[in-house]
Amino acid sequence: MAELLTLARPYAKAAFAYASEQGATDNWSNALQVLSAAVQDEAFSAYLNRPEHTPAEQVKLFAKVLGEDQSQAVSNFLTLLADNDRLVLLPEIAAEYEQLKSQNNNNVDVVIESAFPLTAEQEQLLKSALEKRFNSTVTVSVEVKPELIAGVVIRAGDQVIDDSALNKLEKMRTRLLA
């Protein structure tokens, strides 16, 4: 997964830089989401990756998927990906693109994993603290994961704050076995 993200990052950065320059970040975002969904579809992906399809034919297939939403720039981007055998990276490129778009809008997407459901008040307190820490607007999504036993794990981009009982027990176990 990290390997795919490493390969996808330069493509996402280039797409975002171009889209920002053209004032078309939302159009590119929509196109990348559609393309990402298409690549993740098993039947479409199997057909797309047939050996007899040239990169140009693969781009034509995506043109049919996007329809009117495909600009010349998106077509050129797809050609670049197809020529370098990187179409499989589209989901990672789309995710990285969205992250760049959020950062540009001074917004951070945060996932809070909690052992128990959070009350609205707890969620708001965490959101306020995270907005202060990241100095930007925070969009929070909460996931309940009972295996954490107690506490929370906060994920914001590539940063992780793990204050779960599971993590503390793992650290204790490591120290005892050392």
From Swiss-Prot:
What superkingdom heads the lineage?
Answer: Bacteria
Q: How does it sit in the membrane?
A: Peripheral membrane protein
InterPro entries xref list: ATP_synth_OSCP/delta_N_sf, ATPase_OSCP/d_CS, ATPase_OSCP/dsu
Question: Where does the record say this protein resides?
Answer: Cell inner membrane
Keywords, alphabetical: ATP synthesis, Cell inner membrane, Cell membrane, CF(1), Hydrogen ion transport, Ion transport, Membrane, Transport
Q: Name one GO molecular function term.
A: proton-transporting ATP synthase activity, rotational mechanism
Cellular component annotations (GO), alphabetically ordered: plasma membrane; proton-transporting ATP synthase complex
* NCBIfam families per record: ATP_synt_delta, PRK05758.2-2
Q: What does this protein do?
A: F(1)F(0) ATP synthase produces ATP from ADP in the presence of a proton or sodium gradient. F-type ATPases consist of two structural domains, F(1) containing the extramembraneous catalytic core and F(0) containing the membrane proton channel, linked together by a central stalk and a peripheral stalk. During catalysis, ATP synthesis in the catalytic domain of F(1) is coupled via a rotary mechanism of the central stalk subunits to proton translocation. This protein is part of the stalk that links CF(0) to CF(1). It either transmits conformational changes from CF(0) to CF(1) or is implicated in proton conduction.
Subunit-structure text = F-type ATPases have 2 components, F(1) - the catalytic core - and F(0) - the membrane proton channel. F(1) has five subunits: alpha(3), beta(3), gamma(1), delta(1), epsilon(1). F(0) has three main subunits: a(1), b(2) and c(10-14). The alpha and beta chains form an alternating ring which encloses part of the gamma chain. F(1) is attached to F(0) by a central stalk formed by the gamma and epsilon chains, while a peripheral stalk is formed by the delta and b chains.
The similarity annotation says:
Belongs to the ATPase delta chain family.
Under which name does UniProt file this protein?
ATP synthase subunit delta
